[in-house]
Structures are given as C-alpha cells and as structure tokens.
Amino acid sequence: KSGHRHESXBSTBXASXSSKPCCBHCACTKSIPPQCRCSBLRLNSCHSECKGCICTFSIPAQCICTDTNNFCYEPCKSSHGPBNN
C-alpha cells in the first residue's frame, strides 16, 4: 500500500484540457428544474467541476461523478475519436 491518492483539487493546470467538464452519457429527469446526472466512466479521476467523485480500486481506477445538476455538460466525444458508442 503506497500513499498514492488522486485528489481532484486544481493543483495542476496541465490536466485542465482533459479534465474540463463534459459528459457523453447524461440523463435528466422531466422535473423543473431538471435533475441531470452524468454516467460517464473516466480513468483515474473525474472532471474538474465534479464535487462527488467515486472511483473503483482497480488499476486504472474507473471513476464516475455522482453530482446532480440542472443541466448537462457538453459532450466529450470530440477528444476520444469517432467510433465511441
């Protein structure tokens, strides 16, 4: 066990491009205001705006953001490539 922990504090600006808030799989309720939640899995950390990030203990860790917002972030797909469904 090494003390290797990923804190999603904004300590580095290097990862800002990859960790900018975006979401490919976002679902919203039909209520007003809507309650939207992103179900994207990210490796090792959640995006920079995420307050509730849960990660698995696998390597690499798979992380999901549990935040509920009244909007969806822009899709991330442009950074991943065309065939990502």
From Swiss-Prot:
What protein am I looking at?
Answer: Bowman-Birk type proteinase inhibitor PVI-4
Query: Mind telling me which InterPro entries this protein's record contains?
Result: Bowman-Birk_prot_inh (IPR035995), Prot_inh_BBI (IPR000877)
Task: Tell me the keywords, alphabetical order.
Answer: Disulfide bond, Protease inhibitor, Serine protease inhibitor
According to UniProt, residues marked as the site described as Reactive bond for trypsin are K30, S31
Family annotation (Pfam families):
Bowman-Birk_leg
A Gene Ontology molecular-function term? serine-type endopeptidase inhibitor activity
Low complexity compositional bias, start-end = 9-19
Family statement drawn from the similarity comment of this UniProt entry: Belongs to the Bowman-Birk serine protease inhibitor family.
Q: Where is this region: Disordered?
A: 1-21
Site annotation (Reactive bond for chymotrypsin) points to F57, S58
| Superkingdom, natural source | Eukaryota
**Which cysteines bridge via disulfide bonds?**
C22-C76, C23-C38, C26-C72, C28-C36, C46-C53, C50-C65, C55-C63
